[in-house]
Regions:
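ATP/NTP phosphate-donor binding region
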Residues: 1-114
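C-terminal charged capping/lid subdomain of soluble metabolic enzymes
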Residues: 2-3, 10-12, 200-203, 302-389
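A glycine/threonine-rich phosphate-anchoring loop and its flanking beta-alpha core
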Residues: 18, 130-223
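Generic secondary-structure signature for well-ordered alpha-helical cores
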Residues: 70, 106, 176-179, 185-192, ...
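Glycine-rich beta-strand-to-loop/alpha-helix junction loops that act as flexible
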Residues: 86-88, 119-121, 264-265
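A short, small-residue-rich loop immediately preceding and capping a beta-strand
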Residues: 108-131, 135-146
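Active-site segments that bind and position negatively charged phosphate/pyrophosphate groups
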Residues: 216, 220-333
Length: 389
């Protein structure tokens, strides 16, 4: 007779997200506390990886890491010189980078109690985090995001992934970090386009979850577009808190179901990135994706026109795009190329298509199909808006 043994268990995860300034100041003991937050009272082994673009923009960073380790030799030791890892689209699209990180860590004989300290933008954190999650089924990962986008979103979450097979995040793992340290001093070398692009993720969580935060973004938009430090830090902290709240209380942190509220605007945004050969940055792609879904929701009768106008106005006020020519690219059969993003998104979700659309600022609904004629009309409206501005 067939038999079955049913099993059920729960695993609790917890990790802190710190906000600080100049974490590598030798007078600061924050990182020492991060490495020893379990109270193990020993010298921890740490392998540091640095985004190559960040290292080039901040020539003294690696020396600061070494000096900090020297000053706190009683708390941790660097197992190697900080190793530069390519950032941006290269990190997300080259499996060899993952292999290189794995080889470096393997040669150091890092164990499951050892630390990987990843300092960089979201793509570099994704690549390094993926590699760290594979070694011994998971080393302790401490992320130090160096972009607005990563400090708002990618750097504080529980996912790692790289692009492959023509799809965003085709290969990846769910692996919560040991800790996250959001150091605002790392943002000072960001080019304006990257700084502004990261604010798309703040707009995203405001639209789907928090009308009060959305209103603050509207008020602060001129200062945020200008890169003023205090409003920027406030927006990052608020966006990260909302993002983390969704992970912790949304009921599906590892995405076993089909709903993806934190992917508002991403089905089109990801496709635009692919269509542009990654010339379109993630933040800019998501901004246009949110604009498209906002107009679509309005035309579908889900979102009041006044709310749609506010969303589009905020995206524009922050200096983010609401239209890109790639929206109008077509396949040989005449189908819009961007529509293929719906199929990619469905495959990534698994099972039933589930796209988050706003029904009011701070509220959403899930839809299970998209009308291509409405998508075409929404793109036309965004093109007209783009010409007017």
């Amino acid at each position: 007779m067939p038999t079955v043994i049913h099993n059920r268990f729960a695993v609790s995860f917890d990790y802190p997200v710190h906000f600080t300034d100049n974490a590598f100041d030798p007078a600061s003991d924050l990182l020492c506390g991060v490495f020893d937050r379990l109270g193990e009272k020993r010298v921890h082994r740490v392998a540091a990886f640095v985004d190559a673009g960040l290292a080039e923009a901040r020539p003294g960073l690696e020396a600061s890491i070494r000096a900090y380790a020297h000053a706190h030799a009683d708390a941790f030791e660097l197992t190697m010189e900080p190793l530069r890892i390519p950032g941006g689209c290269k990190a997300k699209n080259d499996v060899a980078i993952i292999q290189n990180i794995v080889f470096a860590l393997g040669n150091l004989h890092m164990d499951r109690q050892s630390f990987v300290l990843a300092i960089g933008g979201g793509s570099m954190l994704d690549a390094t985090g993926l590699a760290a999650s594979l070694i011994h089924r998971g080393l302790r990962l401490v992320r130090m995001p160096s972009t607005v986008l990563a400090q708002c979103d990618a750097g504080v979450g529980v996912k790692n992934g790289i692009d492959h097979h023509g799809q965003k995040n085709f290969m990846g793992t769910f692996a919560p970090p040991f800790a996250v340290v959001n150091d605002v001093s790392l943002l000072t070398s960001l080019p304006p386009r990257e700084r502004v692009g990261g604010l798309a993720e703040a707009v995203k969580v405001a639209v789907i979850r928090d009308g009060a935060f959305f209103a603050r973004l509207e008020t602060d938009a001129p200062a945020l577009a200008a890169g003023e430090p205090a409003p920027l830090r406030r927006a990052i902290e608020d966006a990260a808190a909302i993002h983390l709240r969704q992970i912790c209380t949304g009921g599906d942190p590892f995405e076993f179901g089909s709903a993806r509220p934190l992917d508002f605007g991403h089905w089109a945004g990801h496709r635009l990135e692919i269509l542009s050969g990654h010339a379109i940055a993630h933040g800019q792609g998501v901004a246009v994706g949110m604009a498209l879904d906002t107009v679509y929701a309005k035309r579908a009768g889900l979102l009041p026109e006044a709310d749609a106008a506010r969303v589009l106005a905020l995206i524009g006020a922050l200096g983010l795009p609401r239209f890109l020519p790639e929206l109008e690219m077509r396949r040989p059969d005449g189908e819009l190329e961007v529509v293929r993003g719906i199929g990619d998104f469905r495959e990534h979700l698994g099972g039933r298509l589930c796209i988050t659309l706003p029904t009011a600022i701070g509220r959403t609904a899930e839809v299970h199909s998209m009308d291509e004629a409405l998508i075409e009309a929404a793109i036309g409206e965004l093109r007209t808006l783009n010409h007017k501005t």
